[in-house]
């Protein structure tokens, strides 16, 4: 199978508010918009996309309808401290404070209006113990 595109789709009971959240706080733009589905593309990075879907829509098998759970969205950014300041000033909840992790991340965790966790990350050099676990092509510097 050759994958030509990959993006998460968040099932929600409020498509408009969820799409507005990602447009407002994460600089996404709607490239398709209906009352039951909005396809969002990053205004800063064309290969970054996200979609929002009415969790009760008929395209979802009946047994799977509802809202999302068990999902963590990771956004890698260049200036995690700046994004932290921006989102805190905008009133977003901080579920994990900004910190450096030995495994090679400076990050914090917030959430969208549906409770979907959002991890904002800046890769940093890992500790020596964790560096040995990376392949040479994936080691943050």
Predicted features along the sequence, with ranges:
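Helix N-cap motif at beta-to-alpha junctions
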Residues: 14-15, 78-80
């Amino acid at each position: 199978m050759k994958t030509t595109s990959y993006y998460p789709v968040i099932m929600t009971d409020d498509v408009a508010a969820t799409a507005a959240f990602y447009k407002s706080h994460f600089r996404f733009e709607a490239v398709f918009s209906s009352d039951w589905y909005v396809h969002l593309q990053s205004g800063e990075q064309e290969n970054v996309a996200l979609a929002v879907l009415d969790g009760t829509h008929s395209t979802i098998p009946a047994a799977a309808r509802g809202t999302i759970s068990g999902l963590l969205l990771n956004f890698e950014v260049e200036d995690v401290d700046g994004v932290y300041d921006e989102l805190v000033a905008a009133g977003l909840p901080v579920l994990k404070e900004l910190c450096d992790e030995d495994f090679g991340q400076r990050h914090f965790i917030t959430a969208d209006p549906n409770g979907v966790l959002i991890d904002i990350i800046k890769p940093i050099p890992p500790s020596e113990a964790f560096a040995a676990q990376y392949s040479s092509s994936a080691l943050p510097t």
